[in-house]
Amino acid sequence: MAHTMRVDVVSAEEEIFSGEAEFVALPGESGELGILPGHTPLITRIRPGAVRIKVTGQAEDEFVFVAGGILEVQPHVVTVLADTAIRGGDLDEAKAAEAKQLAEEALVNKESKIDYAQAQAELASAIAQLAAIQRLRQKR
């Protein structure tokens, strides 16, 4: 029997994934993190990007886009508390591309009454969504 861990991915709106997994990869604040069962306890912030979950007994990995959040790792439990989370199959490329364009325009428009940090965060999130869509396509 393979070693597994419980993985929960939740956002403020809903639980996106809950189940047993053999491996989780996600974008940590300092770079890509790979988590296996028995990992040392860890709490860290996560950047916008794709969470890849190797689900026990499934040939295909699960993908979830997160727009940042917190990761908590215990030896046999991984919890992702995401600001926003979207299942890989629910990502909308046209919507993400439009959000990217709007954020870029807001950053260029000096007369705009926008919060610069907010526009940068929206741009980073849109770029990460588009990258997650590309990764998902490559796996198919």
UniProtKB/Swiss-Prot annotation:
Transmembrane segments: none annotated. The keyword Transport applies. It comes from the Bacteria. It is found in: Cell inner membrane. Keywords: ATP synthesis, Cell inner membrane, Cell membrane, CF(1), Hydrogen ion transport, Ion transport, Membrane, Transport. InterPro entries: ATP_F1_dsu/esu_C_sf, ATP_synth_F1_dsu/esu, ATP_synth_F1_dsu/esu_N, ATP_synth_F1_esu_C, ATPsynth_dsu/esu_N. It holds the Pfam family ATP-synt_DE. Disulfide bonds: none annotated. GO terms for molecular function: ATP binding; proton-transporting ATP synthase activity, rotational mechanism. GO terms for cellular component: plasma membrane; proton-transporting ATP synthase complex. It is a peripheral membrane protein. F-type ATPases have 2 components, CF(1) - the catalytic core - and CF(0) - the membrane proton channel. CF(1) has five subunits: alpha(3), beta(3), gamma(1), delta(1), epsilon(1). CF(0) has three main subunits: a, b and c. Produces ATP from ADP in the presence of a proton gradient across the membrane. Belongs to the ATPase epsilon chain family. This is ATP synthase epsilon chain. It comes from Janthinobacterium sp. (strain Marseille) (Minibacterium massiliensis). The gene is atpC.
